[in-house]
Amino acid sequence: MVMLWTIIAMKRFLRFYKKAYECKCKIIPVAINRECRLPQKEIEKKQSFDVWEQLRCRSLDENYMPTVAKIFARKIISMVLPTLYCESGEIFLSHRRIDGEEITAKLYDKIAVMAKEATPFRDVINVKVGEDAQAVIDLEMEKSDVFVFLHTPKSGESDWVLKELRFALLRNIPILWVKIDDADEKKLRIKPSDSAHLSFNSVDFEDEQKLISIVDNILDKSFELIMNRSMQSLEYSEMLREIFGEKVSVYDEQEMIYHISMDRKGYHYPQRNIEQYYQIYGRNPNMKDACRLSDLLKDRELDSIAILTNKILSYSRKDEVSLDSIEDFYYHWSNYLGKFERGNKNMEIVVSGAFPDADEIYKQSLTDALILFAKAIIRDGYELTFGSHPTFQELFFEIAKEECPADYKNKINMYISNWFLNDNEEEANRLRNNCSLYISEKKEDRTMSLTQMRKHMIQRKNVKALVCLGGKIRTNKTEEGIREEINLAKQENIPVFVVGSVGGCSSKVAKEYKETGWSELNSASSELNDKFYDDIDYYNMAQEMLKFLDEMV
């Protein structure tokens, strides 16, 4: 319950307060101006949300009340949905020192003033003298709730910036891309989205009022990205319930805490059940979260406690609580329960993806989906095949190296037309160091060259399925690459799965096939195709598809 603290008739207030108290509401006084900063006697011990102080920190007047309202809303969300959002989350500032250090310093200092609960990270400030700088940076990146990429003109040339971008993408950390001046997007080997979320001139950081506006924009966009990513975690609870069935029960629905009581396997004599509790987080869990959960369950008879997140974490333990990613938790339990079967190692699944035309925040859903599908495909024993894409190829290479470090080249097949490679043997050798490379013939024009490459990539006996995501929508449908790839697959009776929820051309195609009952696309159930149409649980989607393909004769 929120109390806007102006002059209120006392009787009305007391009735209201009594009712709120009886309902066990959390009462938050709001001091609208300097004269009303002390709450009434009944709630004088409660700390107020100070509107005047929020305005003062930003050098703003009362015309900027909507800005403060957004800040207040984030505070309320952190209280009501503590597993999805935390005000004190870490904001990692990624930059190149040679041309980004000064603006990063100004940004860091202003965030520290305007968002006092937040934890910004800047290597020069947060890495102590004598520490292993890269080890600290790697740890802080993994802990971060949002990754702010300050794209200055020289940052695209930095291998360190490339490493940080790759790390954030593969760890499912929301990335806010902030373009500075005329930074060239073409120099980025990895792009977090199709284009930058925000753009500013470096001189804007010299102006106090403009700097305040920049910080507010960054905080607003960061919040949107964090919540968009966090809300995806809600989908995972159903996926885990499906694998555990009646063996899982709800311990606390609001806190997303669940209890597994599972039969033990692999021993001749009777044993007690495995008793495990897990809690799902959308944000990055920390030591306080682990301690709180451990304390909450201290009187329960159990074997283990796990905090799970939809970010990709390195497995760790804090206060006897295991911190792990949801997909790894699912993977290990699936192995234990015998529900995970390796596919035919000589078969491939082709993944076709391109950024759609949409708000930059939601384009990251495509990258998330591609990463989750790629991991699931390789883990299931299939080879991942794709047509060259300058952004996604680096991600696929890294995923293969993580999943199969000893044999990663044989897990990735990349097709490229010589129209784009143009007999560049140096680039071809670089690609061969990361994958099995197939170069198709250069034709008379770009369109014909792409068609030739797509035929070579898709129309082969060892292609098990085609997965389509995103893509640009064209006025002339024949120019849409996804439609051509689907037709090529259908000619060979190769099952096609179209992910609609990432937007773009695949959303249009999925809608068209849904209206015809998914005829000619694949022989999977309407239920599975409907999931591909509008669901956002991409990991579960991939698992369901792989289960269907593994069971195909």
Q: Each predicted region: which residue ranges?
A:
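A short acidic (Asp/Glu
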Residues: 40-41, 103-105, 159-161, 188, ...
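Conserved beta-strand-loop-alpha-helix hinge of the TIR/SEFIR fold
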Residues: 1-37, 98, 137-187, 261-319, ...
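Conserved BB-loop
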Residues: 1, 6-9, 108-138, 153-161, ...
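Short, highly selective alpha-helical patches that border small-molecule cofactor pockets
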Residues: 13, 100, 104-108, 370, ...
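Short, hydrophobic/glycine-enriched beta-strand segments
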Residues: 91-95, 345-356
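C-terminal interaction surface of TIR/SEFIR-family domains
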Residues: 31-112, 181-343, 523-553
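Acidic/glycine-enriched connector segments
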Residues: 1-9, 23, 113, 343, ...
